[in-house]
């Protein structure tokens, strides 16, 4: 290479260096910075021929430094795979065996058909005893009138709780009770409200066939609050243990008078034996009687004014005792006097005894039963009482020791009081609870 070529080559190199100016100025043009030209190399041997090449492209920008690696997770020494696993904890002691599964008890729910004297008092007693009433049916009473009739009672006083109606329901102490106005029991939707036990209080559907309409519409059981011509009859404290839940869906709670007489007759017969007897009930007037004289084709005397007269009447209460105490079948009969009092009646049982006994021995036997097996059903008093003293008494029968008399040790007259409304309604509810207990 000639000296001229060497010079040209150096010029080219200098030009390339100027293109890559080391100064910090951002301009791409040749900058005014002074160029330091290196001295020409010493030529010992002629350099090889160098062909002129285009300037190389600028080097790519260096890649951004990689992000620092995340710090290794802080692992407990015993979590390293290399570390041996800790010994397993000892197994816990076996749990105690679970209690045997019990079928949950179905709650006793009650429906009432007929919101008359007994229907309303059955509702009161259910509220007092914590039994849930789910429905009341009465074709002649709407919910607003039900509130009035239940809240105010001329005989038993005003209901002490809260009573109102809301959305077509009767609400008693915040308990919502469905109300219906169905004339036919088959139309009452018992099945849609939990298949309750139904209390038949109308006095109309007394036979098994008639009361079966409630079963057809979903009632679980039916208790008729009157003597029935063919349904099994039960008096609490006397024969309720004969109830058979497998075959008896419709039963009768007998009459209020039978509920008074039967417990007393049971005690006397078991202790002394009853050869025969006559019963008279002096009975308060009821809703079937007339306030003033009126027509009564089947019972002419019964059509006379209830407030003005003592009215002789028939009753099947004494004969019904033979149904609940079979040993007394055919040994008792009786009659009634309807008198001008609104509530509380009294039974006079005059009987001949098989086993001679003094009157004091008889009273002691009744007193022992009232404190023992018949507690809550039969009561005993020696006080000088009158009828109004028993208004609101929940017992079926209250024996009046001072009112009875004996002709001799085999012939006696025994007296027992009863609230023919409230006492009877308590036994209706007791029978419902007993029947329900037999289903468990």
From Swiss-Prot:
Region of interest (Testis-specific N-terminal extension), ranges: 1-105
Record organism: Mus musculus
GO CC entries: cilium; cytoplasm; motile cilium; sperm fibrous sheath; sperm principal piece
Recorded superkingdom: Eukaryota
Phosphoserine modifications at: 358
Enzyme class: oxidoreductase
Record keywords, A-Z: Cytoplasm, Glycolysis, NAD, Oxidoreductase, Phosphoprotein
Chain sites annotated for binding NAD(+): 117-118, 138, 183, 205, 225, 420
Record protein name field: Glyceraldehyde-3-phosphate dehydrogenase, testis-specific
């Amino acid at each position: 290479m000639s000296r001229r070529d060497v010079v040209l080559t150096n010029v080219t190199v200098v030009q390339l260096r100027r293109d890559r100016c080391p100064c910090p100025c951002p301009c791409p043009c040749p900058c005014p910075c002074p160029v330091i030209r290196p001295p020409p190399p010493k030529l010992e041997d002629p350099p090889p021929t160098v062909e002129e090449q285009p300037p190389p492209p600028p080097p790519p920008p260096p890649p951004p430094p990689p992000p620092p690696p995340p710090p290794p997770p802080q692992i407990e020494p015993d979590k390293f795979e290399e570390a041996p696993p800790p010994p397993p904890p000892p197994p816990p002691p076996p749990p105690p065996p679970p209690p045997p599964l019990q079928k949950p008890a179905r709650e006793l729910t009650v429906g009432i058909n007929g919101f008359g004297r007994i229907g309303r008092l059955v509702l009161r007693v259910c509220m007092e005893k914590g039994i849930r009433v789910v429905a009341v049916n009465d074709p002649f009473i709407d919910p607003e009138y039900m509130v009035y009739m239940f809240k105010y009672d001329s005989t038993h006083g005003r209901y002490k709780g809260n009573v109102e109606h809301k959305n077509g329901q009767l609400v008693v102490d915040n308990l919502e009770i469905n109300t219906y106005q169905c004339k036919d029991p088959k139309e009452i939707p018992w099945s849609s409200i939990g298949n309750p036990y139904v209390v038949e209080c109308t006095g109309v559907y007394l036979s098994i066939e008639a009361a079966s309409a409630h079963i057809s519409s979903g009632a679980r059981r039916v208790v008729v609050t009157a003597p029935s011509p063919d349904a099994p009859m039960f008096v609490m404290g006397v024969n309720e243990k004969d109830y058979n839940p497998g075959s008896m869906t419709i039963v009768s709670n007998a009459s209020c008078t039978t509920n008074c007489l039967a417990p007393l007759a049971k005690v006397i017969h078991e202790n002394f034996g009853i050869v025969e007897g006559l019963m008279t009930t002096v009975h308060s007037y009821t809703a079937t009687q007339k306030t003033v004289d009126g027509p009564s084709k089947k019972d002419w005397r019964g059509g006379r004014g209830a407030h003005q007269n003592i009215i002789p009447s028939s009753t099947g209460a004494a004969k019904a005792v033979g149904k609940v105490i079979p040993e007394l079948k055919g040994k008792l009969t009786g009659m009634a006097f309807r008198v001008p009092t609104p509530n509380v009646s009294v039974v006079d049982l005059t009987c001949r005894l098989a086993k001679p006994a003094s009157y004091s021995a008889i009273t002691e036997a009744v007193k022992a039963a009232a404190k023992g097996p018949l507690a809550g059903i039969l009561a005993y008093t020696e006080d000088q009482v009158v009828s109004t003293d028993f208004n609101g008494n929940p017992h079926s029968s209250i024996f009046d020791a001072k009112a009875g008399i004996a002709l001799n040790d085999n012939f006696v007259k025994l007296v027992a009081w009863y609230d023919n409304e409230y006492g009877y309604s308590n036994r209706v509810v007791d029978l419902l609870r007993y029947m329900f207990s037999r289903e468990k």
